[in-house]
């Protein structure tokens, strides 16, 4: 379970960078005293992007863990999945 490079990582990084851009926009909007509706909309976009990235990362990691169980590492995989479950 030491290899934490997954095929989905570039897509996840892209989503997180998009969220980072949205968050920077939200900060600018706050400083410009934009409307609460506009701010809420952008905050929702940030939240959605982060949730989507987290979900994709967790799903990909579960698949990776299941592949490890096929290789005989079931006890350590179970422990890691239990740790991961608290973030769902």
Task: Put a short name on every predicted segment.
Residues 1-88:
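Solvent-exposed interaction patches of small proteins and small membrane subunits
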